[in-house]
Amino acid sequence: MSAMPTLVLHPGRVTLAELRAIAAGGQRLALDASALAGMRASQATVDRIALEEQVVYGINTGFGKLASTKIAHDRLAELQRNLVLSHSVGTGDPLPDGVVRMVLATKAVSLARGHSGVRPALVDALLALANADVLPVIPAKGSVGASGDLAPLAHLACVLIGEGAAQVGGRIVTGREAMAAVGLEPFVLGPKEGLALLNGTQVSTALALAGLFAAENVFAAGLVSGCLTLEAIKGSVKPFDARIHEARGQAGQIAVAAAVRALLEGSAIDPSHPDCGRVQDPYSIRCVPQVMGACLDNLSHAARVLQIEANAASDNPLVFTDTGEVISGGNFHAEPVAFAADIIALALSEIGAISERRLALLLDTGLSGLPAFLIRDSGVNSGFMIAQVTAAALAAENQCLAHPSSVTSLPTSANQEDHVSMATYAARRLLDMARNTAVIVGIEAMAAAQGMEFDRSLKSSPLIEAQFAAIRGRVAFLEQDRYLAPDIEAMRLWASTSAWPAPLAACLPSFQ
């Protein structure tokens, strides 16, 4: 068996492509050695303050509303342990494996920035867990996104102190067993170490990144399904003329129009009907660059925010070794992540909404010119009639889920923490939304492939024909009504892949 490739993490410079790879697993993570000096210096600063018994929040005080309570030096280890245990109050299903891998990696990166005052050994332990795929069991619910992701990160920290639970090879084991599996003894946490592990936006950021990556996949699938529909109804490519989009100047719109032109290059279908009498296609066809371009702009902006956050020191307080100061602030507040997740949600909803409208167009014989509901013997057969109902149901569900979460706030900790971001929920819903959108887009692509089969006298472009063949490799032509649920699931998986032609990959932030 060959050794896993090593991915070296450079704190402050981890890329989206690296984060996507971390989520997928299959590589060994290592920390850039240059980070060691900064971590040691910040740890020394914290140790000095603890010995001098200066009163500094997070080192020798209580937390939240109890921040004014001074803790004796001989109880600092107890303070940190109690912090971790008392905050392990999450509920709900465990986070997906890929999300937990990103949580481990981004927490290690954050601590390695040298502003948290923890031992390098703690960072090494986080990476050891990730490398062995020993994944802390982190309940998905229980964080309001300020002060950081306290409850879910406490469940991660529990494993480091031999408490809580982890997943090893599909089995659930105790935290102590998990540490033994990577050859480590549970930690006795030093001053500030428990707080540094709990404070931070790593869970909401990892969830938002998972949502971003899933959204990129269905965005690409949505462009392919749109091209398939265009070809099936013999629509016009004139609305994708570069001059139209350059006249407006929106970057995403220009990129999407270029991607569609590249996908359709070499098609024999469009040149075959220059004088068909159709003046303008419906908006769901004609305005693909405008709608999907706006979605791409949202995804690109969210990607920039999340890459910054994945590299951020989001602990509190922060240690500044050049002056020896430990300063309280609010980098744990996940408002940037909440906003990013909200605009990913808007994009996911719209990708599904316009796809569902194209699906409805395909099934309407008066608009598409194709057999009603894409079945030859309609009446006896219902064809894709109720598959469109499923798509409509999921599009409506996504429209409800897309309501901004960041506008919701409830005070906590006796009103000390009086404004929160709700970033964790904002990000957590994205995977559900992406799954819904993948089903919608998958149904459209399956229906469009069906529509193309009613006239195969001419071929589409090489890239679209390749996608047509990929679809036919998953689902057969619908000659008469059959059990469609397995076909819909097969097409959901098609729409969820990350293997897309170069013109699409060139649009997507995490593919760069």
UniProtKB/Swiss-Prot annotation:
Cytoplasm found in the keyword field: yes
| PTM annotation (2,3-didehydroalanine (Ser)): residues | S147
The record, for CDD domains, names: PAL-HAL
Q: Which residues cross the membrane?
A: none
SUPFAM superfamilies assigned to the protein according to its UniProt record, in alphabetical order: L-aspartase-like
Q: What keywords are annotated for this sequence in UniProt?
A: Cytoplasm, Histidine metabolism, Lyase
Q: Does the keyword Phosphoprotein apply?
A: no
User: Where is this protein found?
Assistant: Cytoplasm
Annotated GO MF terms? histidine ammonia-lyase activity
Q: Which reaction does it catalyse?
A: L-histidine = trans-urocanate + NH4(+)
Biological process (GO) annotations? L-histidine catabolic process to glutamate and formamide; L-histidine catabolic process to glutamate and formate
Q: What is its main location?
A: cytoplasm
What is the name attached to this protein's record? Histidine ammonia-lyase
Protein source organism: Paracidovorax citrulli (strain AAC00-1)
The gene name on file is: hutH
